[in-house]
Amino acid sequence: MLRLNRKSLISILLSVVALILVGCGGPSATTPPPPTYSELQITRIQDYLRDIEKNAERFADLEVSVAKGDWQEARNIMRGPLGEMLMDMRALNRNLLAKDQPTPTALTRALTDDFLKIDQGADLDSVTVAQEGFREAEADFKAYLNSLPELS
């Protein structure tokens, strides 16, 4: 009977020592590095950015169409190359780190709203409303480009 108690006591002591060692171990020496962009992400972002900038060249054509009140051409540009540009912007946003996504995502939504305002100007046959939407779109697009993180 005495022998059984010693075994129980030794088991309890070993359990307490193990618990103390595990509890006082602290954080591991190898903490993960801060999140950064992988080479694949950088390549994807640069590819999307190149396509975005290429399609953005059509802003000048949109401005002319709006000024003329050529609503069919304006809509074709917004739904064609500038619509593709919006899709590329959304794809680029998904490739950004979570901390870098909020501003570009909000500006992409704002740009979509600006295009809707141009479309509303076309529905109303109002060059003034459409031009206001165009100016807002141009400003939001420039802000979008400036909001993207520097990639090295």
UniProtKB/Swiss-Prot annotation:
Coiled coil: none
Topology of this chain in the membrane: Lipid-anchor
Signal peptide bounds: 1-23
GO cellular component, one term: extrinsic component of membrane
Alphabetized UniProt keyword annotations: Lipoprotein, Membrane, Palmitate, Photosynthesis, Photosystem II, Signal, Thylakoid
One function term, GO molecular function aspect: calcium ion binding
Lipidation (N-palmitoyl cysteine): C24
InterPro entries the record matches: PsbQ-like_dom_sf, PSII_PsbQ, PSII_PsbQ_cyanobac
Localization terms from the record: Cellular thylakoid membrane
GO biological process, one term: photosynthesis
Subunit structure: PSII is composed of 1 copy each of membrane proteins PsbA, PsbB, PsbC, PsbD, PsbE, PsbF, PsbH, PsbI, PsbJ, PsbK, PsbL, PsbM, PsbT, PsbX, PsbY, PsbZ, Psb30/Ycf12, peripheral proteins PsbO, CyanoQ (PsbQ), PsbU, PsbV and a large number of cofactors. It forms dimeric complexes. Purifies with PSII, present at about 0.4 CyanoQ/PSII monomer; is not usually seen in crystal structures of the whole complex in this organism.
Role noted for this protein: One of the extrinsic, lumenal subunits of photosystem II (PSII), which stabilize and protect the oxygen-evolving complex. PSII is a light-driven water plastoquinone oxidoreductase, using light energy to abstract electrons from H(2)O, generating a proton gradient subsequently used for ATP formation. Plays a role in the stability of the oxygen-evolving center on the luminal side of PSII.
Protein name as catalogued: CyanoQ
Gene expressing this chain: psbQ
